[in-house]
Amino acid sequence: MVSSERSRWALLFADLEAQLAAGEAAEREGAVAELTRAEQAAVRWTDRLRATRGPVRVELSDGEVLEGRVAHLADTWMQLDAGGTRGRVQHVVPVAVVAGIVGLGSQALASQARTDRLGLGTALRALQRDRARVQVRTTSGQVVGRIARVGADHLDVVEVDRARPVDRVVPFSALLRVSEA
C-alpha cells in the first residue's frame, strides 16, 4: 500500500511540475509575442522601404502608380528610378503623398546617413542648379519646364514649351512628383 501511495504522490507532483513548465512556456511565448508587437510598432514604413532592394510599386495620393527601385530615401522625399516607355526615368516623390506601396519586405533599416535629413527643397535645388527639364505633377495637373527657384514651401517652374515662358508657383503641399522630362 505504501508503494502505491508513493506512486500516486509521484504522479501528482510530476503532474504539478508539468503544469508549471507549461505555464512558464506559455508565459515566455506571450512575452516574446508582446516584445515582437512592441518592436513592430516602432518600425516606420520608410525604414522598411530603405531596407528593400528590389522593385516596388508606389501608389500616389491621386491614384498614379510608379514602379521602380528606390535610389535614395530621405526623411521627406524619395528618388525612384523607374522604367518607362522612354527607358529609365527618375522621379522625386514627397513621402507625404505616398498612398501605398507594394513590394516591401518585413526587414527595416533605420536612417543613419546625414543626407537622409536633407529636405525636399534641397533635392529640388539640385535639379534647379542642373537646369534639368522636368515634369512637375501636382494635385491639379502637370507642368513641363525648368525649376527657376525653390523657396521654403514652394518651387517656381518656368514653362518653356510655350510661345512666351510662363512662371508657375507650385506649393510643396500640391506637389505629387517631379520627374525627368
Language model features with spans:
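Short glycine-rich, low-complexity segments
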Residues: M1-E67, A71-V144, A148-A181
